[in-house]
Amino acid sequence: MTAEADTVIVGSGFAGLLLARALVAAGRSVLVLERGGLRSHAEQLRHGGHELEWRTATHSHEDGSRPYPWNYVFGVGGGSLHWTGAAPRLLPSDFTLRSDHGVGRDWPISYDDLEPFYVEAERLLRVAGDDLPLFPRSGPLPQPAHPPSPVDELAAEALEPFGALPQARPSVAVGGRPACCGNTNCALCPVDARMSMLHLLEDEHLLEHPRLELRTGVAVDRLRVGRGRVTALDCVDRRRRRSTVEASRVVLAAGGLENPAILLRSDLDGEHVGRWLFDHSHRLVHLELDRPAGSGRGATHITGASWAYADGPWRDRSGSQLVLPFNQGILGTRLVRDAIVAGDGRSRPLRERVERTLVFDVLGEDLPLPQRRIELSPRRDRLGLPRTRIHYPADSAYLEEARSRLVADLERRFARYGARVVAVERAGEGSHQLGTCFMGERDGVVDADLRHHRFENLFVVGGSAFPSYSAHHPTLTICALALRLGRDLVANS
């Protein structure tokens, strides 16, 4: 049988669609298979967003593992449909953690290898931010930084190096899309300013491209292999109807939980497939000051970032952390809860408490652990496919030590404001599913070019290919890896 396209891509998020764009631009034919549907931004607003998959039982937690709110979307656009737009690069030192500090893993590629693709990804995502010396660059960011908030200005004095957080929310209108409106609901932007892959489809008319076919409502059950190659994909649609897609080259771009699930269902369960799962630790740290902090104002919910805890000699024993001043201040749900507990007349006025509380959104790095893994469950999802069962034990001492050090140090740095830490609460975890098909020259699932170690025409792209993860949001690096893979596939075919 004849292959239906030069390349079959599984998944239509950041990685899948950026790769498809690169291939069709170079004259290659592409078939994209997407388990979910295509829902416009207007439809998302009407329905209040996309249904996150932790609500639809595609996975469960292993007995004894802590419940963890893994959230992801099946749908055209993938994670771009519900991300907040944060788009920093990794630091150069994030690629050499083991060489520099004797822990974790090095990447098989360097910052310099990825740098030109960072520039291209920033251009395509219309990233706004500062040109910070921490991140050597060969080209400027396409959009100026969002103006700093009062909280940023207060934090910058104590938390150098400090600058604007790079983010794919335009600070000025561009290409017919408005600037960020400051609504703070970035995951479902009310004016459609925050970049999504739907913008790429619309602006470049990709769905009308003669060399691109997008099939929605089609899940990949398993890969057929023979003689060191993938030969076909067995698929199932929403009505549980079966089909087979012949393939000359396959790229898995379905995310950190689905990529390994497809390999496991295909009995391609090498030593590392599905293991080394990681996500960022995410904490809101509340500091109460002796004066107003300026919370509740700013262009959007986060505009600045501190790299004071992002790198240093201590990374041999405690993880990197990215500290983001939270312009919103105390979340309304916490205020209501605490007011109910305290009772009327026994708590200070809420207005005073809000004004004097400085909140930091802190992303933390942990070391990859083999115990953190996904495997197949005997239970089935609504398409009849085995669910993934996730084992995600508690944070390691490497992360806990970093968190304790940061909390104590924040009080010291803000001592001039009479600061004391009054709360540290879990927030926003589960959106970054990384590491389950990591890249390595001799170990791992794929090599430095994202090619599977055993099958010459199988590639895995996205966060699942990360060998380690630092404290930085992964999206821009996912995009850069996809663009680099696109260059390589065009050059070698």
Role assignments for model-derived ranges:
Residues 32, 214-215, 460-461:
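Short hydrophobic beta-strand that contains or immediately precedes a catalytic carboxylate
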Residues 100-219:
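Conserved redox-cofactor binding core of oxidoreductases
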Residues 179-189, 221-226, 356-364, 386-469, ...:
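A glycine-rich dinucleotide-binding beta-alpha-beta segment and adjacent secondary-structure elements
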Residues 7-32:
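N-terminal Rossmann-like FAD-binding beta1-loop-alpha1 element of flavoenzymes
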Residues 22, 248-361:
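Mid-to-C-terminal "cap/lid" subdomains and adjacent gly/pro-rich loops that border
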